[in-house]
């Protein structure tokens, strides 16, 4: 076991919107330390949403997407005797945000649009409108937890 809990590093807000969640999103989007490319993709997607999103601004769509994809419950495996049970547990707020960001990026990368900017923009729009793959992932996670509600007393 570790001696002490790792300190949570403070993330600086992004320079354009002053939003810490956008900084975390950019950091998750980044490959091989290429932050400038990840930043271009993120801001490009927000600008594309501004053009196509209708009455909502890009930053509002982004915030709605993150909120809609945040999971409330998830399941963890727990061995009891010889059996492994999927035990539903509540998700901490920091993990909710991290999972939402991770799922949106993962499903955006799997989309069929041409550029990553388009993929990310359309995934964010879908998530904000409560549809799309990342929102479905949240729903599936919740259904899994509901199905295993009987094992909730194994929580630790």
Curated annotation (Swiss-Prot):
Signal peptide: none annotated. Keywords: Ribonucleoprotein, Ribosomal protein, RNA-binding, rRNA-binding, tRNA-binding. Coiled coil: none annotated. This is Small ribosomal subunit protein uS7. One of the primary rRNA binding proteins, it binds directly to 16S rRNA where it nucleates assembly of the head domain of the 30S subunit. Is located at the subunit interface close to the decoding center, probably blocks exit of the E-site tRNA. InterPro entries: Ribosomal_uS7, Ribosomal_uS7_bac/org-type, Ribosomal_uS7_CS, Ribosomal_uS7_dom, Ribosomal_uS7_dom_sf. One of its GO terms (molecular function) is structural constituent of ribosome. It holds the Pfam family Ribosomal_S7. GO terms for cellular component: small ribosomal subunit. Part of the 30S ribosomal subunit. Contacts proteins S9 and S11. PROSITE patterns: RIBOSOMAL_S7 (PS00052). Belongs to the universal ribosomal protein uS7 family.
